[in-house]
Amino acid sequence: MKESFNSAFCVAIFLSSIAFAQTADPNRFQQFLASDFHKGLVMRALSLIPKDVFQTCPTLKSSGPAVAVTRPVTFGQAGRMTSGVWWERLPVSGCNNDTVLNIFFAVSSDSKINTTTGHPGTTHADLVLQHDAVHYAYQAAATEGKACNHFDVMNTRFEGYGLKKPSTPDSGAGSRFRPWWETWTIIGCGHLYDVPNEFYPRSDRHYDCGASWQYD
């Protein structure tokens, strides 16, 4: 059973998810992506995803990740990665939980590669905005799942630019800050709740976000 849910608000700094940067050595970066070390980083990140959100099975399939570099990837003379930030978005299917797994990679000053899993699906929100928005999505789901005390984000789905309520037109593809909305599927105690999430820009380089809990 899925329920659809109107607005509470949060504020977060938005880091553009479409600001791509080239790597200093594309061939070396491709070699890194094909390495066993990289595979280990991915598998470790995926192991942290809650089992009710994603788990592997013998029929798991993936078309391979789409990589979006948001800060240039560089390498030192010894071949170690010295800087870089990027997303890897991995479409998966075959285990009754078809989705896109999102993994964030950031290279620290000591060349350590840190990984963080974002919420699965096609959300356009960055990690900071996801972190703030999820509290309101859980709050929305809890209004229906009152007996449940734990929720997870099962999936996110980007729905489009522009908002209906309040009426906010899309500012266009040439604009860095565009309002958009998504549907977040929340799972709690075996029940699924579809929660609309709205994201709209303010003049101070912040985004407001709202989660809905009113039935359509």
What do the predicted segments below correspond to?
Residues 4, 19-22:
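Intrinsic low-complexity, intrinsically disordered segments enriched in polar/basic residues
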Residues 1-9:
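Bacterial N-terminal signal peptides that target proteins for export
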Residues 8-17:
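Bacterial N-terminal signal peptides
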Residues 22-216:
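Cysteine-centric segments in proteins
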